[in-house]
Structures are given as C-alpha cells and as structure tokens.
C-alpha cells in the first residue's frame, strides 16, 4: 500500500475548501458547500452539519497507518476534523482506526459535544472552553492515525463498520445513528478481498453479500446513515480509475443496504472540503 506522506500541522491550520467531486452511481443529496457554524466551531461543510444534528450518535472510521493513500492524509485529516466542528450539541463522536484488525481496534477518542445547559448555560466562558477542549482532543486523536497500525498488511473497513454497528446498538436509543468512513474504498482481508474483483467490484456485490452473511461478517447497520468518503483515483500502485471508484461506490451501497443502512454519500470528499491534500 502507498505510504502516508503526511506532515504534522498546528491545530489552527485552515481546512481545504474546494468543492467535492462526487462519483458516478453514488450521488448524495444537499451538496451545499458553503461554510456553517456548529457548536464546536467553524463547520466547513454545510452538508455535513445537516447530517450531524443535535443528539446524534456518530461513529467516525478513518484509515490509519499504511492504509492511508500516499498524499491524501491532509484531506483525510481535514474531513475527520470537520466532524468535531460540524457535530450538533450533545452529539457523541467515537473515532476508530481502519487497519487490518479494525473489528478489535479500540477507539482513539469518544466524547460528546458539550451542551449549553447547567453551569454551561450560566457561564459562557466555561461553555466555550469545554467546546474548545472537545475539538482539540478530537484533533489530537486524529493526528495519531498515521502512527496507528504501522505494520498493517491489509485494510478492513468492513470490520470497522461491524464495530461501529455494535457500538451504536449499545448506545443511546432514539438518537440518529451516523457512520462516517474515510478510506480509499478498498477492502483487503481473507474474508473479502476486493482486489480480486478489481475490474468489476459492483458486479460481485450479490455474491459478496451472500458470502459475508453466511460467514456472519455482514455488519448490522439497521437504521444507520452511512457516509463513505476518501475514495482515491489515479493511484498507480492500485491501478485505480474513476470507473473503478464508481464501481466501488455501487458495491458499498449494496453492502450497506444489505446491512440495513442507507448510503447517504459515496465520494472523493465531503461537500465543502477539498478532495486533494
């Protein structure tokens, strides 16, 4: 897999704002790319802010270590950090790394966006300090991702989706469930290796779903909105083209729907956040 080629940055670095390039076959609705303000600070994606309403439960799954495509880390980091800035008050955010052991990887971060209630309602300084702390802690956890799973030899986003589904079932009832997965679109494990379907991943969706279901490896995403971004074209080492990415989007739509979820977006980037680092 490609190396990360990433560089550390200060917390105040500007988020890229070029429009997202949506891939054929998996368009999303409400692609308003104008900036908005979430409780956690500046929200660079109005679309994302609309998805992460107050009191939601959010599982953020992000490629880690060698599963990050070369040159893509700045964009991946910007999208991951945007979740903290766009999430509504009271929204819980859990960050999980995507590695070759995604199902058993412990979360790197789990906390709720502070609400303006109790002492925070009468002390604005305390409230904004708490908000700032939430955003800073989430960003620090995101910055650890390139060093997580450095020896990984495969990528298991399905395992991360399964872990997210399990966590959401055990969480607060009545809240909106959202999974945001940021990775290159490929699954490479013994249970499912999409590289074997490289020419036409979408054409193998039904067979893959049957195999995953029979093996108990199909995630439980009932009632969950799923966002998949970070898909990367023009990767010479993986011979990935835009047509391949469109096929990957159709594949993941089939898997998510078979798991009981709804694929809201499948694209190179979140609307409002640059698709290139």
Question: Model-found features: residue ranges?
Answer:
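Bacterial N-terminal signal peptides that target proteins for export
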Residues: 1-15
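C-terminal motif of bacterial Sec signal peptides marking the signal peptidase cleavage site
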Residues: 22-25
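Bacterial signal peptide processing site
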Residues: 27-30
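Von Willebrand factor
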Residues: 51-118, 121-175, 178-180
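Short beta-strand-loop
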Residues: 99-142, 193, 243
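VWA/integrin I-like adhesion module and closely mimicked acidic/polar interface patches used
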Residues: 186-244
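A cross-kingdom marker for long, charged
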Residues: 236-277
